[in-house]
Amino acid sequence: MVGIIHLKLVSMGIGTDHRCLSNHLEKDAPREVQRVIAPNTLSSDVNADPIKNNKFLGYSRGAHVPSKALALRAERVAPRSSWVLYHPIWTVLRSAGPIHKHAMTWVRQLDHEIQGIVLGPYSTIVGGASRHTLGALERRASLDSLAALTLLARLHHEAGEHEWVWLYICSIFRVLLLLGTHFDQYGVAERMFQLYVQRVFSLAEFEGRRVDLSNYDYVFASYHLVGIAERVRNKHGSQRDRRMPTFYALQALTGLYEQRFKKHFQIPLVSLAES
């Protein structure tokens, strides 16, 4: 199972990386991206017909891992185009054993603002699950904040701190909802969510119950949240441009409108006895 999940993670990273690159170059077809990044791989046969090379098609689907040389070439043409492929979130998700020895290394690979939230005054990883820490990471919803929350959830699980694990799981769920439409633009939303169902949400237990997201429509919920956030934004009038982009969505998840929309964005739970 771990091997299959590892392949899924690599596939997702490669596919998303290729999509980022094609967006930057404003090229949709894999062959057009190939023409810009690796023109030397385009050749013709004796009849002057182009030789079909399916590697870039494979990259776009996450089927092949590009070489480091090719990734560096892409990085020179489109800066930060390969950051998704090498993002620490994939390492955090695929690591099967204890992670406490590697946690600091992974934190140091995250955005500096996220590091400032996760690290305490003596450059130690924060303990507990304060609303200050969770809220700061949720407001900055990104691949980096999601990686940080996932790492912290796993650390607390290793320490047997199940109440804190539950709080982090709830926070991860909210960030996934905030990022859902972004993931969907890259065609990886459902795959990303299912990886979290398998690898992260399964860690949580709450008052004799466990998370059951087997029938949860993640993509629909994410777009529904966007629609709600827009309606909330319109109510705020002149204040709207002063807020962080996630402010209005979080009003529906944890703020003023939480109770009104709770049934749409509450984590489904089932009794452990039913498992």
Model-derived segments and their meaning:
Residues H157-W164, T181-V188, G208-R209, S238-R240:
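Charged, low-complexity interaction regions
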Residues L85-H102, F265, L269:
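Extended, charge-enriched helical/coil interaction regions that scaffold DNA-processing
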Residues S67-P88:
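DNA major-groove recognition helix of helix-turn-helix/homeodomain DNA-binding modules
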Residues V92-L177:
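Helix-turn-helix/homeodomain-like alpha-helical modules used for DNA recognition
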Residues V36-L72:
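Recognition helix of helix-turn-helix/homeodomain-like DNA-binding domains
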Residues L143-L155, W166-L178, E190-R231:
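Amphipathic alpha-helical repeat scaffolds of TPR domains
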Residues M1-S44:
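A short, Lys/Arg-rich alpha-helix, primarily the initiator
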Residues L213-S275:
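Charge-dense, extended regions
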